[in-house]
């Protein structure tokens, strides 16, 4: 199992989440390899990332730091990190902000392994899960869901949740056609898996928005809308 945590100028938030994740991974019976994938952060963030990698390694030795040469986007660095273990049976990623806790991510990984099916975390209020987001992010979230459904016919309750685990063999069949480097890469990924005949299960997770996130609804909405149109055009 290869688990990737993408970061970009985010060593401060990684510090708390990463320590908790390292502890959770060390306690897990699963064979997991963890890669912190830096998406071309500024030079002043390189040393803190290396220090964090070393500190996490004291807790969980199977952690590595991958440094992309330049910033291309979350999708690009996750895909790049996934190529580092081309034989991995499972490929996963979890965002570094801690909105999805390490315990929740491990729950998803166990669910995937037990069911032998790809698993997507989804942000959804249920009797057992909590979902807290700001009003502006909520509007952006619901608007993107509607756009993805209308433009791509994407049948997924929450394509953007930052916690996914995929069967490695299924991903590798479609990896060569994935081009979106930014925040729409999840939608392109799921569309490609669907066209290839792959299936997945969707599991609600506890998700609590954390301060300091990179998503800016007003700034990012137009770019993500254009990305959905690009994905649809390439599918034709």
Residues of each region from the PLM?
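Hydrophobic helical membrane-anchoring modules
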Residues: 1, 153, 177-236
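Hydrophobic targeting segments
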Residues: 1-5, 21, 32-37, 225
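Short, well-formed alpha-helical segments that are part of the catalytic scaffolds
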Residues: 10-25
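Donor nucleotide-sugar binding loop of glycosyltransferases
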Residues: 10-13, 41, 74
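Short beta-strand/loop segment that forms part of the nucleotide-sugar
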Residues: 30-40, 66-68
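A conserved acidic beta->alpha catalytic loop
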Residues: 38-49, 98
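Acceptor/aglycone-binding surface of glycosyltransferases and processive sugar-polymer synthases
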Residues: 68-85, 90, 102-183, 210-215, ...
């Amino acid at each position: 199992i290869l688990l990737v945590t993408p970061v970009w100028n985010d060593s401060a938030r990684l510090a708390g989440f990463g320590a908790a994740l390292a502890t959770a991974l060390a306690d897990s019976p699963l064979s997991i390899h963890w890669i912190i994938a830096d998406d071309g952060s500024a030079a002043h963030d390189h040393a803190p990332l290396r220090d964090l990698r070393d500190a996490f390694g004291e807790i969980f030795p199977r952690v590595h730091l991958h440094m992309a040469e330049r910033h291309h986007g979350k999708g690009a660095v996750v895909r790049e990190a996934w190529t580092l273990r081309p034989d991995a049976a499972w490929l996963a990623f979890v965002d570094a902000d801690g909105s999805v806790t390490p315990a929740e991510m491990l729950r998803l990984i166990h669910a995937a392994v037990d069911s032998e099916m790809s698993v997507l975390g989804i942000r959804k209020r249920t009797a057992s899960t909590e979902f807290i987001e700001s009003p502006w992010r909520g509007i952006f979230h619901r608007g993107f869901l509607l756009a993805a459904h209308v433009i791509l016919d994407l049948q997924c309750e929450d394509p953007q949740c930052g916690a996914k685990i995929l069967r490695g063999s299924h991903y590798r069949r479609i990896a060569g056609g994935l081009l979106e480097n930014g925040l729409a890469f999840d939608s392109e990924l799921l569309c490609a898996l669907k066209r290839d005949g792959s299936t997945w299960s969707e599991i609600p997770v506890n998700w609590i928005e954390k301060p300091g996130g990179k998503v800016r609804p007003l700034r990012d909405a137009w770019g993500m809308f254009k990305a959905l149109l690009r994905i649809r055009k390439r599918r034709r």
